């Protein structure tokens, strides 16, 4: 039995994970969202990245990214010292949003927009079923209108070394 787009997304770990990157693929049709999923270490003392996933939203007609950071925090976070984590630490950890952490917390995470008027309009225009989602993080909100989603585990974490081992050729991920 084939899963619907909504079912595929409901069974995946986007919420309470880290969005590490998102962008259109090199061929500009599809939109990729990379997510790292944390897990507790087996001894319960600390955590590691259990896995990394690529969510490829195919035939993406809308990709809208807006800030989730308030204007007040933006004003406090203007300095370039905040775009590099080590530079921020060396500067005495000044107040502001530390852009340099390199990820956004996916909370509340992904929400499927049931009955989306925008997706319905695109479905009618393209004569293909389209869907709309919103991914909310502490840094950005990502709204996508797309046809399907392909979910691939691209790296597996090791709790002993806390390193991620690639499962696919990362140089070819834009085309696979």
Show where each model-derived region lies:
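Surface-exposed, interaction-prone regions used to assemble/regulate multi-protein complexes
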Residues: 1-176
């Amino acid at each position: 039995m084939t899963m619907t787009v909504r079912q595929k997304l409901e069974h995946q770990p986007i919420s309470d994970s880290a969005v590490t990157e998102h962008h259109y693929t090199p061929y500009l049709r599809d939109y990729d969202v990379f997510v790292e999923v944390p897990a507790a270490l087996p001894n319960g003392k600390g955590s590691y990245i259990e896995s990394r996933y690529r969510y490829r939203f195919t035939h993406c007609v809308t990709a809208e990214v807006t800030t989730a950071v308030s204007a007040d925090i933006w004003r406090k976070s203007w300095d370039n010292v905040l775009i590099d984590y080590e530079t921020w630490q060396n500067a005495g950890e000044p107040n502001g949003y530390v852009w340099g952490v390199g990820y956004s917390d996916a909370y509340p995470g992904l929400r499927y927009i049931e009955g989306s008027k925008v997706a319905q309009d695109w479905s009618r225009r393209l004569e293909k079923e389209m869907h709309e989602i919103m991914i909310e993080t502490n840094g950005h909100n990502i709204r996508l209108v797309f046809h399907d989603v392909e979910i691939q585990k691209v790296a597996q974490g090791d709790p002993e070394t806390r390193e991620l081992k690639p499962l696919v050729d990362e140089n070819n991920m834009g085309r696979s």
